[in-house]
Amino acid sequence: MEQKRLTHLRQLEAESIHIIREVAAEFANPVMLYSIGKDSSVMLHLARKAFYPGTLPFPLLHVDTGWKFREMYAFRDRTANAYGCELLVHKNPEGVAMGINPFVHGSAKHTDIMKTEGLKQALNKYGFDAAFGGARRDEEKSRAKERIYSFRDRFHRWDPKNQRPELWRNYNGQINKGESIRVFPLSNWTEQDIWQYIWLENIDIVPLYLAAERPVLERDGMLMMVDDDRIDLQPGEVIKKRMVRFRTLGCWPLTGAVESHAQTLPEIIEEMLVSTTSERQGRMIDRDQAGSMELKKRQGYF
């Protein structure tokens, strides 16, 4: 079909499927990073379309910090079972032994040890040479300048000044021994595109994205949902039930909710049309320091 006859979402869908198939054909041992969020759900849906009626030719990898929302863990296992996907779960054993957690050690150290180092451990353990991620360019400024094929050296580090041109949808996947790439099939999607596609394709998502009355407290300008009894209440903090939802998901002590009454996908889409803030405004890890996301990516983050 001619491109001009495709709708905006179908053009994005076709581009993403093309990228996923290219990587599966080019690389010896790819993997799909599965963080359980809305972007991961869309990426998995696209991958299933890309190889239908066959099964995925690569596994899913979840780097577990031990601090995800309980609903996320339940959704992860349910999804993998429903689709017959091979699911690999890796948790940094050194971090577990040290008792690393976001309350005691802070967001920067927790993220570095449990996510960045955990990811690098898993990639090395299984020898993956390409890893799909659900990052989008509209999310954050360092991601805006990252290529679809994001090359990493043998230490998994990203050099933003040493990126390859990507002209006419041609991607250069040649790598040397020990090197790898991170692949972002959703690079050109926006948050609004993601939600419209989820509605169009009836994609299952974690219920936390929909507004409901949940136990939250205010801390550091963020609405923190109290998901289990590991909460470390500070003087003056009070847990209250409020109507909230999440625009992005991560470790529950580091992910802020937003007040909302959007309980359906059309209501979320309508809410996004008038939103003037980034979906990552509630991610504590983005506040560590100026340029913190780029620094994390240089060190091997997603």
From Swiss-Prot:
What GO terms in the biological process aspect are recorded for it?
hydrogen sulfide biosynthetic process; sulfate assimilation
Q: Give the metabolic or biological pathway.
A: Sulfur metabolism; hydrogen sulfide biosynthesis; sulfite from sulfate: step 1/3
Q: What Enzyme Commission number(s) appear in the record?
A: 2.7.7.4
Q: Which SUPFAM superfamilies does its entry note? A: Adenine nucleotide alpha hydrolases-like (SSF52402)
Q: Which residues form a coiled coil?
A: none
Q: Which Gene3D superfamilies match?
A: HUPs (3.40.50.620)
Q: Name one Pfam family in it.
A: PAPS_reduct
- What keywords tag this UniProt record? ATP-binding, Nucleotide-binding, Nucleotidyltransferase, Transferase
Instruction: Quote the CDD domains the UniProt record gives.
Output: Sulfate_adenylyltransferase_2
Its subunit composition reads:
Heterodimer composed of CysD, the smaller subunit, and CysN.
What is this protein's record name? Sulfate adenylyltransferase subunit 2
